[in-house]
Amino acid sequence: MATSNERKPAIFLLSLGCSKNTVDSERLTAQAVASGLTFTDDVDEASIILINTCGFIEDAKKESIDEMLAAIGKKEEGIVREVYVMGCLVELYRKELSEEMPEVDGWFGTRQLPDVLAAIGAHYCEELYDRRELLTPPHYAFLKISEGCNRRCSFCSIPKIRGPYVSQPIEQLLREAALLQEQGVRELNLIAQDISVYGYDLYGKPALNDLTLRLSDMGFDWIRLLYAYPLNFPLEVIDTMRQRRNVCNYLDMPLQHINDRILKSMQRGIGRKGTEELIDAIRQKNPDIRLRTTMIAGYPSETREEFDELLDFVRQARFDRLGCFPYRHEEHAPAYALEDTISDKEKEERVGELMELQESIAASLNRKLEGQTLTVLIDRIEDNVAYGRTEYDAPEVDNDVIIEIGDEAVEEGEFRQVTVEDSTAYELFGRVGSECS
């Protein structure tokens, strides 16, 4: 039975993909709320479904398409009135999608915020651009410091999707950060497709360290740096981590591979020697830093010997956090011109082999934390168990600290001292102590 849409003028927003997409969705939500619109977490209580898609890899594309089809189904059942789709997948396939899914009421790319708002009955206001309605827990947020990318990594379609690199001015980012602080944000995670070159286009020099210092002065409890590119990385940021208590001793720097031939084909602009020298310099400047990286296994023509070289490198480098993904042959990426020579089965086996190695490294590193007392930010509480993170763990991807809280008064979003009693490769188990001031 069709439901009366007039009685529920709410929007169901589904934000897929990365944290950069999350920020886009938060900006949109803030503008829509300022125009008097409401949002609901229950799709059956909505009159409009709005999907912010991801188009980075095949699995993400499939998820986005599946969600579109589900939304169309809700429209055909009379549960919702309109369906709109925005984001990265639309940038790549707008024509094909609109032909295949005429039931969708509007398609919008990554740079069409005013148009999306107009379609759902809201008004775009430039003065509200810095405002966001958080989709994360209220104690942490992502600060997107730039748009787009000027790198030309062969496996990546982001420059085609997001356009050229554009830094956001420092003063604008400080205003946005101040608004987030007013909302109760304690942990600020700096993100971009490439944070390493932040500021070059605006100031003619690297400005990541200047931005980090200014944000540190604002008094956030934690400031975290994510998605650094190894080429042209500004090492002075590592000095700032060591000197400023509220700048986390943590860096996410995807390396993708270590073999020189593969790195050259990937168009990374840096080889093994430069990569190893950079890692050594970072660790010498800040021995307490935790490094997270990402690798790709099964890149076109990667030989067994080249993959073994990657394994040996990871074994020696002992990264604190590491993710590995099988190479995906994406039609909008430059490497699509190469022959995808390695079977999916072999790719998955290589990923498994590398992650098994990393699991043993992570387990060994975590065992060394047993008996130590660490500062932990409590993310959530479920069934009398608290889940949190140390400064060495980014939201959603790194270690959980799991705490049986018993009769302790523990709240989400607070910092507590936790003594680690046990561990696995990706979890720490502890007991809670005092609240941090």
UniProtKB/Swiss-Prot annotation:
Keywords assigned by UniProt, alphabetized: 4Fe-4S, Cytoplasm, Iron, Iron-sulfur, Metal-binding, S-adenosyl-L-methionine, Transferase
Domain of life: Bacteria
CDD domains: Radical_SAM
GO molecular-function term, one example from the UniProt record: aspartic acid methylthiotransferase activity
Catalytic reaction equation(s): L-aspartate(89)-[ribosomal protein uS12]-hydrogen + (sulfur carrier)-SH + AH2 + 2 S-adenosyl-L-methionine = 3-methylsulfanyl-L-aspartate(89)-[ribosomal protein uS12]-hydrogen + (sulfur carrier)-H + 5'-deoxyadenosine + L-methionine + A + S-adenosyl-L-homocysteine + 2 H(+)
Broadest EC class assigned to this enzyme: transferase
Keyword rRNA-binding part of the UniProt annotation: no
Family annotation (Pfam families): Radical_SAM, TRAM_2, UPF0004
Chief localization: cytoplasm
Cofactor descriptive note: Binds 2 [4Fe-4S] clusters. One cluster is coordinated with 3 cysteines and an exchangeable S-adenosyl-L-methionine.
Residues engaged in binding [4Fe-4S] cluster 2: C149, C153, C156
Xref: InterPro entries: Elp3/MiaA/NifB-like_rSAM, Methylthiotransferase, Methylthiotransferase_CS, Methylthiotransferase_N, Methylthiotransferase_N_sf, NA-bd_OB-fold, Ribosomal_uS12_MeSTrfase_RimO, rSAM
Family: Belongs to the methylthiotransferase family. RimO subfamily.
Xref: PANTHER family: RIBOSOMAL PROTEIN S12 METHYLTHIOTRANSFERASE RIMO (PTHR43837), RIBOSOMAL PROTEIN US12 METHYLTHIOTRANSFERASE RIMO (PTHR43837:SF1)
Job of this protein: Catalyzes the methylthiolation of an aspartic acid residue of ribosomal protein uS12.
Protein name, UniProt field: Ribosomal protein uS12 methylthiotransferase RimO
Species this protein is from: Chlorobaculum parvum (strain DSM 263 / NCIMB 8327)
Gene name of the record: rimO
